[in-house]
Amino acid sequence: MVIQPSLLLLLLLTLQDVDSCQGPELVRELVLAKVKALFLDALGPPAMDGEGGGPGIRRLPRRHALGGFMHRTSEPEEEDVSQAILFPATGATCEDQAAAGGLAQEPEEGLFTYVFRPSQHIRSHQVTSAQLWFHTGLDRKSTAASNSSRPLLDLLVLSSGGPMAVPVSLGQSPPRWAVLHLAASAFPLLTHPILVLLLRCPLCSCSGRPETTPFLVAHTRARAPSAGERARRSAPSMPWPWSPAALRLLQRPPEEPSAHAFCHRAALNISFQELGWDRWIVHPPSFIFHYCHGSCGMPTSDLPLPVPGAPPTPAQPLFLVPGAKPCCAALPGSMRSLRVRTTSDGGYSFKYEMVPNLITQHCACI
């Protein structure tokens, strides 16, 4: 059998790069060292800042975190507070009295009806204050001349049992406007998906101008976590993030010890946090590294080369020179690349890079 010089040179170069002729006691530290060398050879060293000696870090807003994976710091998080403005859900005019949920006025009572739809954000947060802004159209003289025995404005909410009074207090307001501050006991009203408010103002007139549309102002903050949520947050984090491929490795049935004695493709879950590069390589957080491992104890005489396109089995050695000792190595041309996303400025810019010939697809005794 005559081996072509080009094939011989290719196999020699593959052996030099893979470093697969290791003993059966191949440890994790050696694999990690080899992986780090392959990454540094393909991507170069990470950009360093002037003080910490690590990749440059800039603090990012929480919404810029990648894939929900955030680096935890010892600094306290900012309180989640917000302000929301709600307008009536329907836009009926004064002339369109029959529109469902629109603006309606009963002249004999001066009753105005408004339908609000609080957002999911408001319903999931704790309301700390709420005000209803209503355009009365009355100047201060008209307000003072009104009957003092009855309040100028009454606020009611439509419930299953009929209209119910809402406790409010009048606050400072611009001319021709009224600001009704809802009492704390009325804050749960904003947790309903539909809120129907009835405002009674006998002296007020209906106005269909857009600039006189009433609105609700609600201030909210995040709810205090429950006992279960606090327990989940206080649980210690795993040393590295798990991936679906790593879970499949754990869930597969156990193998016979003899299966690991011969040349085979081994797998190792590696995270960039474990390598100290989680601030440089931001995606993926981890990957499954495949490499060749095992011995080649089969006889080395009179075995043909494998058929092109069909990877050899672990018991099918491939020889360079007759009489040479075979070594468990990756089949030439079967290495797969890994695409990663890196950053050198803490997340303001990203770069897609490729680490070629990193993951082994097929192993053989060469």
UniProtKB/Swiss-Prot annotation:
SUPFAM superfamilies: Cystine-knot cytokines
Post-translational modification (record): Proteolytic processing yields a number of bioactive forms, consisting either solely of the mature alpha chain, of the most N-terminal propeptide linked through a disulfide bond to the mature alpha chain, or of the entire proprotein.
GO cellular component, one term: extracellular space
GO BP annotations, alphabetical order: hemoglobin biosynthetic process; male gonad development; negative regulation of follicle-stimulating hormone secretion; ovarian follicle development; regulation of cell cycle; regulation of cell population proliferation
Signal peptide range in chain numbering: 1-20
Pro-peptide region(s): 21-63, 64-233
Taxonomic superkingdom: Eukaryota
Molecular-function GO terms, alphabetical: cytokine activity; growth factor activity; hormone activity; inhibin binding; protein-containing complex binding; signaling receptor binding
Pfam families, per database record: TGF_beta (PF00019)
InterPro entries noted in UniProt: Cystine-knot_cytokine, Inhibin_asu, TGF-b_C, TGF-beta-rel, TGFb_CS
Sugar-modified residues: 147, 269
Cited PANTHER family: INHIBIN ALPHA CHAIN, TGF-BETA FAMILY
Functional description taken from the UniProt entry: Inhibins and activins inhibit and activate, respectively, the secretion of follitropin by the pituitary gland. Inhibins/activins are involved in regulating a number of diverse functions such as hypothalamic and pituitary hormone secretion, gonadal hormone secretion, germ cell development and maturation, erythroid differentiation, insulin secretion, nerve cell survival, embryonic axial development or bone growth, depending on their subunit composition. Inhibins appear to oppose the functions of activins.
Subunit structure: Dimeric, linked by one or more disulfide bonds. Activin B is a dimer of alpha and beta-B. Inhibin A is a dimer of alpha and beta-A. Inhibin B is a dimer of alpha and beta-B. Interacts with TGFBR3L; this interaction regulates female fertility.
Name of the featured protein: Inhibin alpha chain
Upper classification of the organism: Eukaryota, Metazoa, Chordata, Craniata, Vertebrata
